[in-house]
Amino acid sequence: MDTEFANANHPLHFLHRLLPAVGPGLLIAIGYVDPGKWAATVEGGARFGFDLVLPMLLFNFVAILCQYLSARIGVITRKDLAQICNDEYDKWTCMFLGVQAALSVIALDLTMILGIAHGLNLLFGMDLSTCVSLAAAEAILFPFFATLMERCKASFLCTCIAGFILLLYFFGVLISQPGIPLSINGTRTKLSEESVFALMSLLGASIMPHNFFLHSAIVLQHQGPPNISRDALCLNHFFAILCIFSGIYLVNFVLMNSAANVFHSTGLVLLTFPDAMSLMEQVFRSPVAPFGFSLILFFANQITAFSWNLGGQVVLHNFLRLDIPNWLQRATFRIIAVVPALYCVWTSGVEGIYQLLILTQVMVALLLPSSVIPLFHIASSRQVMGVYKISPFLEFVALISFMGMLGIKIIFVVEMVFGDSDWVGTLRWSTVSGSSTSYIVLLITACSSFCLMLWLAATPLKSATRLDAQVCNWDVQNAVSEPSTLIEEEFLTENICTGEELIERQEQLPEPGKSFESYSNITVANADPDLPETIMESDQELHLTTIKEKHSEVAFSSPQTFYEETSPTTESASLSASVNLVPDAELLVAKKAKIESMDPVEKTLDIEGELHTEKEDDEGDNWEPEDSSKGVPGSTLSLTSDGPGSFRSLSGKSDAGGNGAGSLSRLAGLGRAARRQLAAVLDEFWGQLYDFHGQITQEAKTKKLDALGVDLKLASSQLKVDTAGKESSGYFSLVGGRASDSLINSSLCDSPKQLRVQSNIDSSYGVQRGPSSLWSNHMQLLDAYVQGPSQSIADSSERRYSGVRTPPSSDGWDNQPATVHGYQIASIANRIAKDRGFSSLNGQMESPAPISPSLGPRNYRDPLTVSMGKNLQNGLSSSQASGFQNLAVTRNSPLQSERPYHDVYSGSADDTGMSANTKKYHSLPDISGLAGPYRDLYMSEKNAQWDKSAGFGSSVGRSAYEQSYYSNTGSGAGGPLSFNGLSKGHGDAFSLHMTPDPGSLWSKQPFEQFGVADKIRAVGSGLGNRSNSINREVTSPVDSEAQLLRSFRHCIVKLLKLEGSDWLFRQNDGADEDLIDCVAARERYLYEAETREMNHVDHMGGSTYLYSDRKSGSALRNDDASITNIMVSSVPHCGEGCVWRSDLIISFGVWCIHRILDLSLMESRPELWGKYTYVLNRLQGIIELAFSKPRTPMSPCFCLQIPASHQHRSSPPASNGMLPPASKPGRGKCTTAATLLDLIKDVEIAISCRKGRSGTAAGDVAFPKGKENLASVLKRYKRRLSNKLIGSK
């Protein structure tokens, strides 16, 4: 029966044995859930790849060794390490050890504060100064929660919470690991002077000095069952520590591997705290990652505080002789930690915070050599540990570990003083300028710690010194022929009197008779000191607990019995001075009588027993952590930035990147290449309107593009009527007309009158695409913004940095023929063969394969046929072949001026003079509804040349559908098509009719008889054909506004395609920014819907134009640029309250200014400063329009509706079923001049702190010049905004 009962309780018994070992390990390991350690790990991986993986593993083994030795000391001696050091070292040595432990605790507290501040910043959007203050203020909650629970309950609860957090932390990383391959194929470790700084930071992140003292103290609070031997208990502690620290290393390895793959492989450098945090947030690929991090850090901070409450007071009492309440102790440490945090936030910004985290770990590493000496000395001391001293092998491992730490420290100090590494230069220039004390602090810390280490290494333990003196006296006493009893009594009396102070310092162990028992350990002269360590502790402890009541039994035992019943502790060494000279067991009678008659000994034991009980009561203080995840409503967010913006993660509102993080890895989620592209896209857009002085360009005035100041009150039928199928290549040669757009914008091109209005405008370059006047109108609108060849930044930067953030692209699709009409095939055949890899075309091209029936439904689903039919068919007779047009380009056309950039098209027409030797197409099938979409689909793919012009008209010579129809001619299966010359009879228009025979290849298909294709064709047929004359008519304000809005849509789509663009549209600023966020959310939805539709068609095998190098990926990747064309063909309009009017461009200007200033807060690359300066220079023209007079915020209209099923993916999220939410309460006003002035001040402070390395081109030229240029434009902004601010008052 007893056996069955024991078996039933076996799991409970196992847990009862395991918890005393696992509990202390969990409470210690929770301190490694620390942003400082993440930053050090990510920094090592980002700078040196996988070179530091092996050193980090070795550091983890050393940490396991140190924590095991600390726990072993507590288990064996039943005293914590601080108490033993107090016994073994003098007062001043203990004081310095206490200062080192306090510095380590303060460093941990500092990193925890910064981590919690970062979490608050992500969750609530507050600036970092406020977040740091709030994170520090939570210390006042500790006394309140500490009084709510009893000591044992608080300890158990905190242990459980610590285990739960660590499990979430470990398994969360492993389960949610991003798609970054783990590189475990043994890379060689390459160490150099450049990596010493990173090695020191990893060492400090792996081992914390105060944990040595804390672990041994917590072990005393988690005593194991009395029937377990101490060897078994030590083994339990070892396995618990091994498992926990293995999990910590696994997490660090995943972080380092991710950093090496994301940052080191792409050459990016981390410079800010959000950079490191962004990678950690990427590892947890969940939308609730910021909230989870904040919660984990909050609980980790409270449990760390509880752990220090369990053992920290003993440390301070034994080292610093301080007896202060726990709450005051915690508040003092918190205040000391907050001072450098706030100083760094105010002076150095986000980049300074990141450097502070790394420097904190380095400073902790500098303290390690002097901190491990007491640990290793005591663990290997026979006088303290007795037979439980560590084995010679462990002593050797400890010595090697110490030498390794000391060697790294020496190399670090020597390099810091005499070296010229990059990290040394970074520390030195701040010292020369007097703006930072980090170099001096590290140097002082290293020197003082080195001196203390030498002192500790040269100072033996007091117990060892006393034992040596006793051995000397033993030899002298053996030469004296006196009665042994008299010698013993005199010696014992003298030593007890003179050693009273020593006895009073001993702590009473749980067993009252332990001090007496310790005498017997040394009394036995013939005892073997190398007795095997297999004595069962259960028997020893049984005798020890009854020793006070059975003195006679113990006193008259044999010497061997005394030794077996002894627990070798510190008392055995400290009291041995009074009993070591007794050679005979007979003297034990006198010794026992004298000890029992001594009041000081008994008094000391009794008092210490009471103190032990009181200490247990005092150390029970704990407080239950409060959930810090309570949301703050968006209405409490301020529009202004409080404090230096450079110290905030992009105004404290970055989402992953971070906030995350240029030169930085991902500055607020935008990589370096993405930021370059962002600046290029914005410069490209605003370059159509403003020059670099913020003035309207002459060309914009000529073409009436300065429509932002015009109050247009035109009917909706005249506002957004342009449904051109082609935007200029500067914005990805657009094709419009999506089914979703068609359904929403019912007023688009729904009457012949609207078409006639637009049909009166010809192309400004005199290029007529076929007989369609509407086409001419649109090309005139698109060409109006041509700026010249200088706008090649966007796509060239994409190609150049494609390996960093964007998929690689080629220009194989860039220079394909726009159409076969109006061009000589021979002049472009070689170019096509080069790009497409054809061996030869020989003047002939294969026609596409017969159209798949699956293309029909695709055409039918787009009822408006905005770009698929209308752009091709307007102005054509219903009997004309609308799939192709004739382009008659005259020799005097202004298009010739664009030949350097469009020579493939204009050159062919100009050089050949449209020779009559070439043959012209005379008839073509009416497949406009089929060929158009798929010609458009791939038109912009790899559009490196045409996507970089500033305006809309740089690719005048090619139409939206002409480009891609023959882009994959090599894959066609049809018969050859001959193109010989431009027929005079058909130079301006198609005159051939289609064969009406339904069985003919050219007959109208059934699905072409529906929709609006015929309607548009009929309307177009009445417009007639137009000549190639150059029409320089000035466009109306309506047309100008339509052009700008289409360009704006195109710009938004390009921004959405940037890697990490989510941050751009989730900043929750003013009403203008919220409106742009809603527009971006709508455009994203449309884009993704079209992507899914295209993917569905491809999956069904309906596309004959699939190109071989198409890659799968994100819906907003650059390799899906072709789908962009289908989205931006028109401008929505839902009525009088529609947001799609010129005011939207003003809001976009405010948004651009805000985003550029936000990026400038954290940017540290002079190259990008220059790009931001270009954009800000142009955006000066918006200031007058946006801030000269109060503006009424526009609310999102029905054009911005998003289905409820998609709202969780949109940004910002919608609050109702259809419409995005209006501006949030409290933030419903437009961004004011005061808001931007505060932000500009923050940028100026941030930029002033950025410096390059002296003696380099970057430090001596790029940084000063970049700062000068950016500061200049910021001053102009301040002057203009200040004037507007005064005027508004």
Curated annotation (Swiss-Prot):
Residues 611-659, 792-816, 1208-1227 are annotated as: Disordered. The N-terminal (1-562) region seems to be regulated by upstream components of the ET signal transduction pathway, and may in turn regulate the C-terminal region. The C-terminal (454-1289) region regulates downstream events of ET and jasmonate signaling pathways, and can confer constitutive responses to ET. The nuclear localization signal (1274-1281) is required for interaction with ETR1. The modification Phosphoserine is found at residues 646, 663, 923. One of its GO terms (molecular function) is cadmium ion transmembrane transporter activity. Glycans are attached at residues 185, 227, 521, 745, 1025. GO terms for cellular component: endoplasmic reticulum membrane; nucleus; plasma membrane. The chain crosses the membrane at residues 18-38, 48-68, 96-116, 128-148, 155-175, 199-219, 235-255, 260-280, 288-308, 335-355, 356-376, 393-413, 439-459. Residues 635-652, 807-816 have a biased composition (Polar residues). This is Ethylene-insensitive protein 2.1. Residues 616-626 have a biased composition (Acidic residues). It comes from Populus trichocarpa (Western balsam poplar). One of its GO terms (biological process) is manganese ion transport. It holds the Pfam family Nramp. The modification Phosphothreonine is found at residue 819. It comes from the Eukaryota. Keywords: Cytoplasm, Endoplasmic reticulum, Glycoprotein, Membrane, Nucleus, Phosphoprotein, Transmembrane, Transmembrane helix.
